[in-house]
Amino acid sequence: MATVKISLSLASLSPSSSSSSIQSKLSPSFIPNAAPAKAVKLRFNGKSLRAKPMVYRSSRSVGVTCSASSSLTTLPSALLFDCDGVLVDTEKDGHRISFNDTFKERDLNVTWDVDLYGELLKIGGGKERMTAYFNKVGWPEKAPKDEAERKEFIAGLHKQKTELFMVLIEKKLLPLRPGVAKLVDQALTNGVKVAVCSTSNEKAVSAIVSCLLGPERAEKIKIFAGDVVPKKKPDPAIYNLAAETLGVDPSKCVVVEDSAIGLAAAKAAGMTCIVTKSGYTADEDFENADAVFDCIGDPPEERFDLAFCGSLLRKQFVS
């Protein structure tokens, strides 16, 4: 069965657009595992709009019409983003470089090349990643022998690496991925709770959210990151914590992830999950995802928006 990708674009609408003429094109190339969905009520520039997503398993172009309406429907209760690879494609030229600079400054004679780091990303968490690597290839001569002291050694490396990484973020050398700010704005405007759930250090995640999304958005976004839970992805602990803290039903949450381990965590938490592939995860297995795209996208190259997220929940409830 052929599949196509759809995108519901509200960003190009203007306040002067008439309710009968508001229309946007869909950009076909991949379709998620979704069924035709009911209209979704959104607010745009003071107007109540009704987006009617039409999902087809075909390679032909399709369209969607948005019209002013008072019809009520259900949007996600919460929109949960992973950080690295979703908000920003940080891994290859961000975290990897910062790890290597840390190793160099500590004179450890360790370098993670692009391919090796891609393999290490299958392990959730930077401290866990370093520990697994050293356990496999051998610990540096400068590392302590005692297990407890090794944990402190790894924690020190990770703290130094985080500080180097934050410099990259604060200098805005790593941009937001296309469509992230748009989707966050749509959620916040329509009363959908927004959170970032990441295995990365909390300071690094907060820096990304504050510096790249801006302080006004950041103060409305809840962050769950680092060691806030004892187990990292693919364990669902961080998504379970997010749902509990936000006071939302996991089945009414939509997660945006970029990796197979992130997808596994979201699904284990009972949540709907959209995957936006990143540089390191393009070839991973996303068979269990509710939708898969190359990115969120900004108009006119938009892939999906908040209305589409709602359509996936509707499909879940009627299936």
From Swiss-Prot:
The active site is at D82 (nucleophile), D84 (proton donor). SUPFAM superfamilies: HAD-like (SSF56784). Keywords: Chloroplast, Hydrolase, Magnesium, Metal-binding, Plastid, Transit peptide. Its cofactor is Mg(2+). Pfam families: Hydrolase (PF00702). Its EC number is 3.1.3.-. Changing D84N: Loss of catalytic activity. Gene3D superfamilies: HAD superfamily/HAD-like (3.40.50.1000), Putative phosphatase, domain 2 (1.10.150.240). Changing R129A: 97% decreased catalytic activity with xylulose-1,5-bisphosphate, but no effect on activity with ribulose-1,5-bisphosphate. CDD domains: HAD_CbbY-like. It is an enzyme of class 3 (hydrolase). One of its GO terms (cellular component) is chloroplast stroma. Substrate binds at residues 82, 91, 125-129, 158-161, 198-204. One of its GO terms (molecular function) is hydrolase activity. It catalyses: D-xylulose 1,5-bisphosphate + H2O = D-xylulose 5-phosphate + phosphate. The keyword ATP-binding does not apply. InterPro entries: CbbY-like, HAD-like_sf, HAD-SF_hydro_IA, HAD_sf, PGP-like_dom2. Mg(2+) binds at D82, D84, D258. Belongs to the HAD-like hydrolase superfamily. DOG/GPP family. PANTHER family: CBBY-LIKE PROTEIN (PTHR42896:SF2), XYLULOSE-1,5-BISPHOSPHATE (XUBP) PHOSPHATASE (PTHR42896). Highly selective xylulose-1,5-bisphosphate (XuBP) phosphatase. Also shows activity towards ribulose-1,5-bisphosphate (RuBP) and fructose-1,6-bisphosphate (FBP), but not towards fructose-6-phosphate (F6P) or ribulose-5-phosphate (Ru5P). Degrades xylulose-1,5-bisphosphate, a potent inhibitor of rubisco produced by the rubisco itself. This is CBBY-like protein.
